[in-house]
Amino acid sequence: MITIDKILEILKNDHNFREILFHEHYYYNWTQNVTFNALSYDSRQISSDTLFFAKGATFKKEYLDSAITAGLSFYVSEIDYGADIPVILVNDIKKAMSLISMSFYNNPQNKLKLLAFTGTKGKTTAAYFAYHMLKVNHRPAMLSTMNTTLDGKSFFKSHLTTPESLDLFRMMATAVENQMTHLVMEVSSQAYLTKRVYGLTFDVGVFLNISPDHIGPIEHPTFEDYFFHKRLLMENSNAVVVNSQMDHFNIVKEQVEYIPHDFYGDYSENVITESQAFSFHVKGKLENTYDIKLIGKFNQENAIAAGLACLRLGVSIEDIKNGIAQTTVPGRMEVLTQTNGAKIFVDYAHNGDSLKKLLAVVEEHQKGDIILVLGAPGNKGQSRRKDFGDVINQHPNLQVILTADDPNFEDPLVISQEIASHINRPVTIIIDREEAIANASTLTNCKLDAIIIAGKGADAYQIIKGNHDNYSGDLEVAKKYLKR
């Protein structure tokens, strides 16, 4: 519940209030008592006591008209649509929605310890490590790209890396109702660009890495803009953890100089001194030997990042150790074995940098033929297509099958051809993803060989023309073709 007086107070304090406009009259205050028992940005979810946010570049007046027909009596907007109900006019609808949602749900962020991860890659894995560390002796909730849990028992698929602010604070409130003590979440650059976490301060923020990604017409116009929005997490955290090996580390180091911080990686005190496939040793604040199920040194580095963050939250080394040993992540380096001994690796690697690291890990363990099944999503991250080609060109013996990966409103054949245009040798294009995996499964001969299925991980859908069409998932499809 929230009153009109409280809403106006919030907006005025944030210098985000213009006026209330009703029947061509302007109001700085509203003398009538009005209470809202629901918030919505979806015109299909409206009741008479709902406060509606008219937001988005594609918003149309007919959406508002539909909401008014359903009983809407007040809305918030940057634009006066000339409707027959009062409008609270603001300078920034996204800021308004975040702060009003925060208050509506009784400031749940103050009742949880908040841990956030940002980075081009590794956010989900690091979040899972932290979740398992905290779970040993606490009650963490988690919002991740892969899965969300608000009670530690039931999990559901997330549609955005970081939810819309209204949904975010509703989820936090549910976690509080479920007596959760901590919230682990991923914070994307888009979350700051679209102000989904506006006004939110995290107890610990972690910056894992940075490389060009999410650059395109509907995302970030330049790498500089992408990097800037990533760094905003540092300015909105009470303590930070940063990878000293990341590109452009110096500016981040300067930015966090006066914030309590820990660095990890080769240029810090917190460093891996010994790395095996399923164990590693760390010196520094986390000094110990750790068992780990996820192969690859980059996963060990993600574990260190999560461990340092949890240490800041009061988690013991023993709980950190147990958490790392227990962590698995759906769609991250999941391994199957064909009857001929060849390995199939299913991984979410979905940009050039993560593909590069995935190939390095697989090639370290598999010395025979390696077949890569790969695609790129439509209508976002166009720069990935060239990045994939550049990485593939560094592996001349890699056999490549290009396929569909969430083509959305683009033609998957055109996407595949664009990737192929950046590759300096012939590749195979099989648009049907299951058919591509089936074809790859016929190309192995012995235990030294491997198939890498990259991009979708555990996603049990294909995004086609705006819809989430059913798809068994790469792991389930691969299981059909183990006999060789």
Curated annotation (Swiss-Prot):
Task: Kindly list the GO CC terms recorded for this protein.
Answer: cytoplasm
Q: Which reaction does it catalyse?
A: UDP-N-acetyl-alpha-D-muramoyl-L-alanyl-D-glutamate + L-lysine + ATP = UDP-N-acetyl-alpha-D-muramoyl-L-alanyl-gamma-D-glutamyl-L-lysine + ADP + phosphate + H(+)
Q: What is its EC number?
A: 6.3.2.7
Pfam families referenced in this protein's UniProt entry, alphabetically:
Mur_ligase_C, Mur_ligase_M
Q: Which InterPro entries does the record associate with it?
A: Mur-like_cat_sf, Mur_ligase_C, Mur_ligase_C_dom_sf, Mur_ligase_cen, MurE/MurF_N, UDP-N-AcMur-Glu-dNH2Pim_ligase
Disulfide connectivity for this sequence is none
N6-carboxylysine modification sites are 230
Q: Which NCBIfam families match?
A: murE (TIGR01085), PRK14022.1 (NF010628)
- The protein, known as: UDP-N-acetylmuramoyl-L-alanyl-D-glutamate--L-lysine ligase
Organism of this sequence: Streptococcus agalactiae serotype Ia (strain ATCC 27591 / A909 / CDC SS700)
Native organism taxonomy: Bacteria, Bacillati, Bacillota, Bacilli, Lactobacillales
Originating gene: murE
